[in-house]
Amino acid sequence: MLDLKYVRANLDAVKTALANRNQETLLAGFEDLEAGRRTVLAEVEELRRKRNEVSGTIAVMKREGKDAADLMADMKEVSGKIKDLESGLKEKEEALNELLMRIPNIPHESVPVGKDENDNVEVKRRGEPRNFDFEPQAHWDIGEGLGILDFERAARITGSRFPLYFGDGALMERALINFMLMTHTTRHGYKEVLPPFIVNRKTMTGTGQLPKFEEDLFKLEGWEYFLIPTAEVPVTNIHAEEILEEEALPLYYTAFTPCFRSEAGSAGKDTRGLIRQHQFNKVEMVKFSHPDNSYDELEGMLQNAETILQELGLPYRVLNLCTGDIGFGAAKTYDLEVWMPQQGVYREISSCSNCEDFQARRANIRFKSKGKKGTSHVHTLNGSGLAVGRSLAAILENYQQADGSVIIPEVLRPFMGGREVIEK
């Protein structure tokens, strides 16, 4: 959530930022609401001033034994007007707050201006795509051929866009989770968290999923509970309504969770395979940072995600997302995209974002500096480290052999009983 004082003082800059996000209409009504609020506030303050002034006069008259009944009657009427105006003022402030809840973050100055994903800027590439001496197969065909993925049975059990792993497929999924968590906790300094997979409305609002994106969420019927779309939601809210000590920053957390997304608006996209699922596993990284250091922390988080891809031996590239493609709560986002040989394209496998104080303001996460008065909002960062199903899909495609078998990346072998290959 943006700071209302900032929006008031920098309205033109906010309008430009929203226009760069293709969201220029979101501020419609703000100026009218703000003008109405100021008018009512001025009336309230004038009546309060009058009430205080006349109250003093009444006190003097009473001390002097004079009749103040008429003034007291007037003040009773003024108090009633103040009460009514204060109620109207509260309504306007709530309307402004509701409007702010639907306005996205302001992009950082280093974010390229662009309309959509076609304007994202490639930062770097790492690893050379493999030259196959046979026609590479899609990961779903490889997995079904090896008997480790079964989308047909998954569809019977639940419906489309759900995975079902067998044998070495389930083992590799678990190996990836363990490898990612071990790397982040033992080498990158994160503390592992196992959070709830169901959260309440306030928690979803704190990280920015609500109120704007409710249709993308799975809601429990009859409850104000939601299945999490990412571990970012519960982990960021660990410190909601808390004041942290400055010396405790930065805080690093990592968590494995299943994630649940309705994929509203994705009809016809990635209908096969593990790329776009209603349920998928992900290892998440979350940081709470001092505002002065948050962009250094973003670069570090990006490196942490890159390490996983490098250790797995998967070719990838890094994109700096443009203003038209960046997420709702992010001030800056790097996407990591892994090479998928069968499609001949890079596909997203991680997003690393600095949300600055946008989420912290919504969730009321602050820190106190030693020797200073007051508190400030922390900066929050989140990143995939990585999406597990997509990592497995990338391994199947990049490590496939002509006979249909798949070589297991060396770093996963200790988690898979020393196995070197998956074969029929």
UniProtKB/Swiss-Prot annotation:
One of its GO terms (cellular component) is cytoplasm. One of its GO terms (biological process) is selenocysteine biosynthetic process. CDD domains: SerRS_core (cd00770). One of its GO terms (molecular function) is ATP binding. L-serine binds at T230, A231, E232, E284, S384. Its EC number is 6.1.1.11. ATP binds at R261, S262, E263, E348, I349, S350, S351. It catalyses: tRNA(Ser) + L-serine + ATP = L-seryl-tRNA(Ser) + AMP + diphosphate + H(+); tRNA(Sec) + L-serine + ATP = L-seryl-tRNA(Sec) + AMP + diphosphate + H(+). The keyword Protein biosynthesis applies. Keywords: Aminoacyl-tRNA synthetase, ATP-binding, Cytoplasm, Ligase, Nucleotide-binding, Protein biosynthesis. Pathway: Aminoacyl-tRNA biosynthesis; selenocysteinyl-tRNA(Sec) biosynthesis; L-seryl-tRNA(Sec) from L-serine and tRNA(Sec): step 1/1. It is found in: Cytoplasm. Catalyzes the attachment of serine to tRNA(Ser). Is also able to aminoacylate tRNA(Sec) with serine, to form the misacylated tRNA L-seryl-tRNA(Sec), which will be further converted into selenocysteinyl-tRNA(Sec). Consists of two distinct domains, a catalytic core and a N-terminal extension that is involved in tRNA binding. Belongs to the class-II aminoacyl-tRNA synthetase family. Type-1 seryl-tRNA synthetase subfamily. PANTHER family: SERINE--TRNA LIGASE, SERYL-TRNA SYNTHETASE. Homodimer. The tRNA molecule binds across the dimer. This is Serine--tRNA ligase. It comes from Desulfatibacillum aliphaticivorans. The gene is serS.
